Each structure stands twice: as C-alpha cells, then as structure tokens.
C-alpha cells in the first residue's frame, strides 16, 4: 500500500510539474514584461497552469528553443530574424524548432523627447545624443535605426550613447544623458519618464512610401498605425502616425501540444481579464491570433485550437 501511495504521489507530482509554464520577457518595466505578467495571471486564473514570468536582459530566444523556458513574448520581426539566423543572429544558424503560438497586440513604438524640447521631427535628431549599442538587447538598436532611417538618417548622423538595454536607456534619458528615448506606448518606463522630466512627447514618422520602405527594410512586417490621444498614453496630443509591429508568443517545437493548446485557448477567451491587468490589451484582437508569422511555423497545439475556433489561416 505504501509503495502504491508513493507511486501515486510521484505521478501527481509529475503531472503538476508538467502543468508549470515559464514565460520569458524583456526586462522589468518593459512593455512585454507587463504584458507577460498579465498573460501569466490569466493562465493561472483561467487555465489553472502554474505560470511564471522570467524577465531577461536579452531576447531569451536561446532559452526558449533549448527548453530552459517554455514561452517567449517577442516582437514579430525579431522572431523571424532568430528563426532564420539573420540580422543580429547572423552566423548562429537557423533555429528550426522555434514555433509560433499566436499574435497578441501591436507594439506601437515611438521616439520620445521631453515635452519642452525643440525637436519636432525625427530629422531634428541629427547630431543629438541617442542611445546605442544595446549589447544585451540588439533588437532595440535595430528599431531605433529604423526610426532614423525613416527620416533618412543613420546612427552615423547622431551622437551615440552606449547602453546595454532598453530600461537602462530610459534611465539615461531621465538623467539627461540623452535627448530622446525609444519605447513602446503604454510602457511603465514611459510613465516614469513622463513624471520624472515634466512630460514627454512622441515624434511622428514620415508615411511616404519611400520612408516606410526604409523602416520595413530593417523591420520586416512593420507597418504604420495612426494613434489617437488617450489618457493611458503619454506624449500624444493629436492623431499621430507611428511605427507598429506585432507582439507575438513563440515556443519550442517540443513543448507538449496540450499545454500550448491550453495557453492559446486561455488567451483567446480572456481579453477582458488581460486588459484589466495591462490596459494595452484593449487592442488585442483574438480573431487575429492566427495571423501568420514570417518563417516561423505554427505550433501544432496552437493550430489545433485555431482550427476549432474557426480562425486558422
């Protein structure tokens, strides 16, 4: 009897362990970290999974494909570059076991300046102090380079201020070491900077076909989105054209289908709960979760749910 009870206990322990999931995000205070926390809460409350958020200084893709972590909250173009071994991942080879779980919300991103700054356009940043390098988060440097390219500039046209990651960049901006700060709208760091420097203001992008193409050359899949002023968004006083790209969730191919199915289902069915924890989820369109991701195939568990929900491509 004791032997049987021991076996049963081991079985229960293994089952409980199988239902634990980890979600890698960018550093605490970043947009994806706040989104990851909201998703973890839904997975705990609605899917009855043991979800833990792991904030990383780097992208966390290596941890995802190796199995150190289960899910990764990223931007669409970075997942594509990692999967194909291109861009910042050149020379590392393709990662063919990266799988797509679904599209979440658009990253609406912008270069922010102080509200009383004389800069009105991105072109006005020529010769100014801008964060660079991003040794532990190369994707941020790429996004800033895309904004500069939109205005016909490169990093060679500005004063480069090295920084390791996006959160340290915000600290430098608040310490007046830089003239502008990149961040996704609605991020905790933007709210902090807004309070710290007496207000921030976003710089609108050029929507001409040539300018948009320069952005997309660096950010595959990016697009222009018009954003209206809203109390939850700092730095906007009028309808403004900004760069956007999708936040996506990815996982490794070997992750159990039933776990991925539960995650996709819980996110699809609980938009209100997600938005209650992280307001930008108000932009989440569950029916667009199956929007294809360039060069990254769907995870079978996610695709199974999307077919059941009638949204599979």
Where are the regions that the model predicts?
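Sec/Tat signal peptide C-region and signal peptidase I cleavage site
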Residues: 14-18
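Extracytoplasmic small-molecule ligand-binding "clamshell" domains
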Residues: 31-65, 72, 235-237
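An extracytoplasmic/periplasmic, membrane-proximal ligand-sensing/linker region
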Residues: 175-177, 185-202, 207, 214-217, ...
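Ligand-binding clefts/hinges and TM-proximal coupling segments of bilobed small-molecule sensing domains
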Residues: 127-146, 222-283, 290-291
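Bilobed "Venus flytrap"/periplasmic-binding protein-like clamshell domains
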Residues: 19-45, 50-51, 107-175, 292, ...
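Pocket-lining segment of extracytoplasmic ligand-binding domains
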Residues: 76-78, 85-89, 117, 154-156, ...
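Sec-dependent signal peptide recognition
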Residues: 1-8
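Acidic, polar ligand-binding/catalytic clefts
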Residues: 71-105, 188
